[in-house]
Amino acid sequence: MEQKNFDPDGVGVDNGTYFGLPFAPETAELVLISAPWDVTVSYGAGAAYAPDAIIEASTQLDFYDPLAPGAWRRGIATADVDYSLLESSQRLRADAARVIDHLEGGGCLEDDYVVRKVRRVNEGCMSMNANVGAQASRWLDAGKTVGLVGGDHSTPYGLIRALGARHAAFGILHVDAHCDLRDAYEGFEFSHASIMFNVLRDVPQVTKIAQVAVRDFSESEAALAASSGRVATFDDLSLAAALFRGETWDAQCRRIVDALPQEVYVSFDIDALTFENCPHTGTPVSGGLTFNQAVWLLDTLTRSGRRIIGFDVVEVCPAPDERIDAITGARMLWKLCGQTLKSNGS
């Protein structure tokens, strides 16, 4: 569809792009790349199918956003989805699942049965990282802001590395039920549970990670967060306790944002939200933020004058008989697009 024929008040058109928008990546300000990949998920699989499901659900969305009115008109484009990632994910997921089953049955990573499988998974994840990094670099070098739609939470690594090569210092607003600070969880160096550990290790340009709504993490993760000097933890229970004591959500959001530098990457795991928003996400945890709390946090970030330099939405798991996960993912993606464009000026 040509841009001149696009009617934002008309019926959403399923043209293979997020939100059915007509923008080409070459002319848009914001380019969305996709990573259909969920090799290392440790509980429920399915996030690899999120990009297609979110594209389909996103055409049911109306465009007016009172917090970022008209921002979409500056251009939100969809880069071609590389479905070779999905094919590799499906193949390697079988190896990863056998490793996980072996460990859950009391086996060890040193056992001959799993050694080659772990190696294949790790090599495949490195290839995925390179693929995402190359996609991101192409559009960053063209002057675009890049957002990523996963996929599991391992998928943004290549984008974050690419941003690290182009920014001297930035922070990450990490909204998630989990800290993702595990070192090679289940033997997988680039596990979805290891993304922030890997960022701390490999991207020194990330000066601060503000982790929000985390509520399921290990003792070693808590110790790393407390000792690193680069992690600020706003766990779900502490946020709830502050509300119970009378601190408004607006005040808490300002406190969270104050922990971050001027340039910020947003990493949004859908399991940060309450169950009704993402009933099929791979590793659900009781508690969490409401949708509007999350949106208010994003708006607080942009109202502070900080600039969003990129983002991801991950761990959306569509179900064949229920659409709420994809709907929530599409609507959170829309809010992130609007806030990102707003934060980057007119």
Task: Kindly label every feature range from the protein language model.
Residues E2-S346:
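Conserved alpha-helical scaffold segments that buttress catalytic/binding sites
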